[in-house]
């Protein structure tokens, strides 16, 4: 559903000149799921999950390619790191989290996934959010958000995948900035500046 929406909404524009498609629909749906949570808290929940989906999709694409070449290489962490792909342990892969999205312990599973990814990827140590198990976070909402994010294809070929991730992050940050009562320019760097 999200993939089809991207093509249908190509004509809408955001404030930075980027095409709006699935980002707006994704944010509207995700925003409804947040309940009474403050946008400043919710952004970490949503963006952390989107990043997790992105690295898991990249890992799975590389894993599939390596399996076709050499099954033994597919289990070698260095094969992924050599291609600038994060190693994602089995318990941290999106497919595992999606399969368990409706479980009452989904918050703990996500926190454990983030810890496992940090453990196996030095550059991510201490960076990923690990507070999905907190009691104040509605686990039903969290499971629904996982299902929603599962519809985003973040494993496109080459730079297109990074562009999709960037579009989602940029749009979400702009929306969160507005929800927090700040002008978007005070909250994140616009696309035009990033390219400079």
Give residue spans per PLM region.
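Non-catalytic, mostly N-terminal accessory regions of nucleic-acid modification and defense proteins
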Residues: 1-196
């Amino acid at each position: 559903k999200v993939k089809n929406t991207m093509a249908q909404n190509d004509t809408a524009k955001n404030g930075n000149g980027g095409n709006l498609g699935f980002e707006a629909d994704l944010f509207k749906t995700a925003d409804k799921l947040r309940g009474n949570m403050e946008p400043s808290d919710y952004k970490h929940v949503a963006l952390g999950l989107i990043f997790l989906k992105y690295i898991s999709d990249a890992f799975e694409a590389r894993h599939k390619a390596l399996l076709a070449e050499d099954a033994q290489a597919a289990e070698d962490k260095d094969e992924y790191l050599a291609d600038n792909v994060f190693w994602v342990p089995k318990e941290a892969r999106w497919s595992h989290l999606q399969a368990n999205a409706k479980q009452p312990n989904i918050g703990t599973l996500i926190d454990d996934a983030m810890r496992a990814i940090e453990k196996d990827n030095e550059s991510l140590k201490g960076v990923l959010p690990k507070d999905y198990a907190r009691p104040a976070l509605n686990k039903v909402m969290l499971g629904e958000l996982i299902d929603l994010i599962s519809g985003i294809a973040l494993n496109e070929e080459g730079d297109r995948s990074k562009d999709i991730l960037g579009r989602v992050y940029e749009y979400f940050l702009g929306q969160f900035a507005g929800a927090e009562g700040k002008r978007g320019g005070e909250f994140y760097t616009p696309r035009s500046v990033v390219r400079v």
